[in-house]
Amino acid sequence: MVGHPMRVLVIGGHGKVARLLSPLLADRSHAVTAVIRDPDHAADVTADGATPLVADVEAMDVAALTDLVRGHDAVVWSAGAGGGKPSRTYAVDRDAAIRSMEAARAAGVDRYVMVSYFGAGPDHGVPQDDPFYAYADAKTTADARLEASDLAWTLVRPSRLTDDDPTGLIETSRTGAGTGSVPRGDVALVVAEVLERPGLAGAVVEFNAGDTPVEQELDAVTG
């Protein structure tokens, strides 16, 4: 476990999971910088316990992203295009994500946590004519690039997200969990726990709602 406060850069800081993550990290004495595209969201993320940083990661090159990342101890990618045109999905969920990995490496920030989705990978099985295909394909490429990097990465892959109250209980694919659903609050808790566990570098955490406390379930996951 990490025994000291970290400086965590959360990309996609106004997303639903990120907004639940920031207060968890702040409560654990970590300093959170929330990257947001819309300056009107600054008050929200400040209320979450994070320091807002306005930047459009979709438009930034690796050099600019390196400046953004530098000075932090960890990066959390929780950004996404949120549907819409496939071209933008690829621009954000694949291209910008990959540039952020390159930036983290250039900035000397080794710890990198990617929020992906349960089932991502070459065998995602989404047909090309499905509206979800662009996202599945973009995530497959981005996740593979992260796994091939020399960063201390962890892939967090929740199943279908809900706004139900968090329970603090999950089940991972390690114990046979199939795709189901999980509250966003529990996803945020998993990310917070993963950040504090260097031993989960190189691990893929696929999970949904279950019966085992998050901390206990993650104890059994190895990188």
Language model features with spans:
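Glycine/proline-rich active-site loop of Rossmann-fold NAD(P)-dependent oxidoreductases
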Residues: 124, 165-170, 194-203
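Core catalytic loop region at the nicotinamide-binding pocket of NAD(P)H-dependent oxidoreductases
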Residues: 194-218
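Substrate-positioning beta->alpha
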Residues: 97, 138, 156, 178-193, ...
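NAD(P)H-binding glycine-rich loop region in Rossmannoid oxidoreductase-like domains
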Residues: 34-99, 103-106, 195-199
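Flexible, glycine-rich beta-alpha linker
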Residues: 122, 154-175, 207
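Conserved Rossmann-fold NAD(P)-dependent oxidoreductase catalytic core, especially the SDR/UDP-sugar
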Residues: 31-35, 39, 81-91, 95-148, ...
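N-terminal Rossmann NAD(P)H-binding glycine-rich loop of SDR-like oxidoreductase domains
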Residues: 6-30
